[in-house]
Amino acid sequence: MGDRTITYSPAFTLVPTYECFNRCTYCNFRQDIGTRGWLTLKAAAKQLAELDPQRVREILILSGEVAPNSPQRSKWLERLYDLAALALDQGFLPHTNAGPLTRAEMTALKAVNVSMGLMLEQLTPKLLQGVHRHAPSKDPQLRLHQLEQAGELGIPFTTGLLLGIGEAPQDWAETLTAIAEGHRRWGHIQEVILQPHSPGQQQAERLPPFDLKQLPQVVQWARSLLPEDITIQIPANLVTEPEVFRACLEAGARDLGGIVPLDHVNPDYPHTDLAVLKEQLQAWGWELVPRLPVYPQFVDWLPPPLKEKVKEIPV
């Protein structure tokens, strides 16, 4: 029958800032610059103090982006670093996703993150005239370079595709192939997320939702195109049709990502209660088990202080 294990990361999200210089038309996360203050270390410490380290392992640091040429950029990076260091001090394992970074920025954050991430989304440049026409950092070549840079720096990395934002099915194969090629060079990709576009109340333009009935086929293609040691992840809160969810697992999806109190990217789609989700999977013959934000095969890649932190935390 084979391995019938599905993993997830018990997680909590810290948002340094919702302000972002990109204006992706489908975004339900960003706010205009100057409309909301940044998360202070004091406020973050209060949020972390309310968590149970026995139940939460990962602190996802998910941030809006400050423009590369902004005078606020260095302050922003310092805040990302300090929040990750704070999470480590409180007994959690940080994973940062904050948009494209320079080599120096990525190197700095490597010291305080057990893994990092950036969605490639889609490799086709045509989206730069569509949903990404006001989003400079969504240049696909810039994002592909980030994957390469993470590999060169030996950073365990998560990436993925955003489905249903104006691309064609052949674009999925091109994007998956590019991820596979980068992983064959560096071996650093932990998982690839297949995220269906799911409309929310805050986005600037109404896009139709991705047709979930296509998702099992995308999972199947991903499994055939990606190396076997890359895990395929689907967000359980966005795959709202049970039979589609089940078909995705049978097609090769093996991880549900971070299960958090609030999905800040898709705030209109709450996660199913964990006990209910476990029961549902069990009825289908699957066992849901927690994991850390760094996969076991990558622990030895980490700087010694981080490696020790990981060893202190039970799965």
Swiss-Prot record:
Keywords for the protein's UniProt record, in alphabetical order: 4Fe-4S, Iron, Iron-sulfur, Lyase, Metal-binding, S-adenosyl-L-methionine
Residues annotated to bind [4Fe-4S] cluster: C20, C24, C27
CC cofactor note: Binds 1 [4Fe-4S] cluster. The cluster is coordinated with 3 cysteines and an exchangeable S-adenosyl-L-methionine.
Domain of life: Bacteria
Residues in Radical SAM core domain copies: 6-237
Keyword 4Fe-4S on entry: yes
PANTHER family the record matches: 7,8-DIDEMETHYL-8-HYDROXY-5-DEAZARIBOFLAVIN SYNTHASE, FO SYNTHASE (COFH)
Family to which the UniProt record says this protein belongs: Belongs to the radical SAM superfamily. CofG family.
Matching HAMAP family: FO_synth_sub1
Name assigned to this protein: 7,8-didemethyl-8-hydroxy-5-deazariboflavin synthase
Source organism of the structure: Thermosynechococcus vestitus (strain NIES-2133 / IAM M-273 / BP-1)
Lineage of producing organism: Bacteria, Bacillati, Cyanobacteriota, Cyanophyceae, Acaryochloridales
